[in-house]
């Protein structure tokens, strides 16, 4: 919004909260869309457009959209890079990443019913520092993976339910 301020009279934003890839179509009807406009007339137009695209439309100010985007990076981008790291580990040991898909499906399904903090599982969420230590020992040869594992495990240990 601030990009247009003072340059044009009527302006606004339609912000779909979704990951987009050329390789996969998405059902836009289910995508949350966030809108903001410089004035009520423009807001009405953008809202009408957004409601034609999605069943989930709401107004959100620019400052809050920035926080929404940060949350999306954690929820989507960082989760995916963790899957990339998992694939790297599996491939090193002759396993296909597809073995993770049922686990990931169940993880996402739980998030439809539970708050993420309540859905957290694994050794750190149980406070099992012995298993965490054994995993870190196995990862000693890969500094990056070891650091990520350590930081995430520490966060989970400190923020357990």
PLM features: residue spans?
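Histidine-centered active-site/metal-ligand motif
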Residues: 15, 69, 135
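Rossmann-like NAD(P)(H) cofactor-binding subdomain of soluble oxidoreductases
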Residues: 1-26
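Long, contiguous hydrophobic alpha-helical segments, chiefly transmembrane helices and signal peptides
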Residues: 14-20, 33, 75, 79, ...
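Alpha-helix C-terminal capping segments
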Residues: 1-8, 89-91, 139, 156, ...
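Functionally constrained cores in energy, signaling, and assembly domains
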Residues: 9, 18, 27, 79, ...
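Short, well-ordered alpha-helical microsegments
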Residues: 1-2, 42-43, 132
């Amino acid at each position: 919004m601030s990009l247009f301020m003072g340059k044009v009279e009527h302006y606004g934003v339609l912000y779909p909260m979704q990951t987009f890839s050329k390789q996969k179509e998405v059902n836009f009807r289910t995508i949350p869309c966030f809108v903001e406009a410089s004035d009520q007339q423009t807001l009405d137009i953008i809202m009408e457009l957004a409601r034609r695209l999605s069943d989930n439309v709401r107004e959100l100010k620019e400052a809050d959209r920035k926080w929404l985007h940060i949350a999306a990076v954690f929820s989507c981008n960082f989760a995916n890079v963790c899957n990339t790291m998992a694939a790297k580990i599996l491939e090193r040991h002759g396993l296909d990443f597809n073995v993770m898909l049922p686990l990931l499906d169940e993880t996402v399904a739980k998030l439809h019913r539970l708050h993420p903090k309540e859905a957290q599982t694994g050794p750190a969420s149980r406070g099992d520092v012995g298993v965490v230590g054994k995993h870190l020992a196995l990862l000693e040869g890969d500094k990056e993976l070891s650091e990520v594992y350590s930081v995430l495990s520490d966060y989970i240990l400190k923020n357990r339910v």
